[in-house]
């Protein structure tokens, strides 16, 4: 059985820089129903050879039974779990697999699926490597775990709204794309390889705007970006990027539904009082008077509210002379503290 994702959604999952799997725990032996390309590259197993099988084929002689039982217990209890387990690739080579798993409920609110995200921690079995492994685990937890947890959370929300993980994931692929761009920006900034975990926000938001404008596909609708220079922690950038993705997409979907051309302005400005203001302004039809977005609405509205709350930000919607203006005020004082903490750790 294969998970029912549209082809462009499979491409979005496939481009992720980490291994992702989905298992259906309602079926006998809890088989995998989807794996992405990063999983194939990490393990050496092809998708066709593993879909329909329980993931125990990754286990071997030196796999800790205790780790296996902890994972099994989490599945039985429908709980999130994080574990580092010794697994084996298709060619028999062993490696440490840092695994994060989270449950998904079906439309009847029954625990049916488990999403697994895996990070290859290397091959060494030596006890002398414990300190180095601990350091790498800390890096994974700090840089990656929060973003992977956000993906699991978004899949959970999307599946509950769409009637199960086999439904269409048109919006989800865009949300994953925003995180994929973050990882690319980390590489450009050196944050994925060095100790610095800070990235320039403006460049990241510019890439998100370009990607969303491209996905929209209407050449006569322009997205202009103007961004002050500001560095933020990677975790913060991820949240802001997802938030901007939601607001931009909302503008493109609704502001120009009755016309073929228009302009959306994306600005990020450092304000007095140690605040960052992110503005999305369009010259479209304007938000209806009876619409209380994002306090009411669809899945995107719910995600916007959660991201705003997580950033400790304030969001205000203004109906302009033409179009709509969305201002998001994010406290920079907290972000500066996080940056200072990161550099102190380094």
UniProtKB/Swiss-Prot annotation:
Its EC number is 2.7.13.3. Signal peptide: none annotated. GO terms for molecular function: ATP binding; photoreceptor activity; protein histidine kinase activity. The modification Phosphohistidine is found at residue 142. Residues 139-334 form the Histidine kinase domain. The modification S-4a-FMN cysteine is found at residue 55. Residues 8-82 form the PAS domain. PROSITE patterns: HIS_KIN, PAC, PAS. Keywords: ATP-binding, Chromophore, Flavoprotein, FMN, Kinase, Nucleotide-binding, Phosphoprotein, Photoreceptor protein, Receptor, Sensory transduction, Transferase, Virulence. The keyword Repeat does not apply. This is Blue-light-activated histidine kinase 2. It comes from Erythrobacter litoralis (strain HTCC2594).
């Amino acid at each position: 059985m294969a998970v029912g994702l549209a082809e462009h959604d499979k491409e979005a999952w496939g481009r992720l820089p980490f291994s992702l799997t989905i298992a259906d725990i309602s079926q006998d032996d809890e088989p995998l129903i989807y794996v992405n390309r990063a999983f194939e590259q990490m393990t050496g197993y092809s998708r066709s050879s593993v879909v329909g099988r329980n993931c125990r084929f990754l286990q071997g002689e030196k796999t800790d039974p205790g780790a296996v039982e902890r994972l099994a217990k989490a599945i039985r209890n429908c709980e999130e779990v994080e574990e580092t387990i010794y697994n084996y690739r298709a060619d028999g080579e062993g490696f440490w697999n840092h695994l994060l798993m989270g449950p998904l409920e079906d439309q009847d609110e029954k625990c049916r699926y488990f999403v697994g995200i895996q990070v290859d921690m290397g091959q060494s079995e030596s006890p002398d490597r414990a300190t180095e492994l601990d350091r790498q685990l800390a890096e994974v937890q700090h840089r990656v775990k929060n973003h992977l947890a956000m993906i699991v959370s978004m899949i959970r929300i999307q599946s509950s709204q769409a009637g199960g993980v086999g439904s269409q994931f048109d919006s989800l692929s865009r949300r994953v794309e925003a995180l994929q761009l973050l990882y690319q920006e980390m590489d450009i900034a050196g944050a994925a390889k060095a100790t610095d975990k800070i990235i320039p926000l403006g460049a990241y938001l510019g890439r998100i705007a370009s990607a969303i404008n491209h996905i929209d596909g209407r050449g006569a609708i322009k997205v202009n970006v103007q961004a002050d220079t500001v560095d933020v922690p990677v975790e913060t950038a991820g949240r802001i990027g997802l938030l901007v993705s939601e607001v931009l997409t909302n503008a493109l979907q609704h502001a120009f539904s009755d016309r073929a051309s228009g302009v959306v302005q994306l600005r990020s400005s450092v304000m007095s009082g140690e605040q960052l203001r992110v503005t999305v302004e369009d010259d479209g039809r304007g938000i209806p008077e009876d619409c209380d977005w994002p306090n009411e609405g669809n899945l995107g509205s719910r995600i916007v509210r959660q991201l705003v709350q997580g950033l400790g930000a304030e969001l205000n919607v203004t109906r302009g002379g033409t179009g709509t203006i969305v201002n998001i005020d994010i406290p920079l004082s907290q972000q500066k503290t996080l940056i200072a903490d990161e550099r102190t750790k380094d």
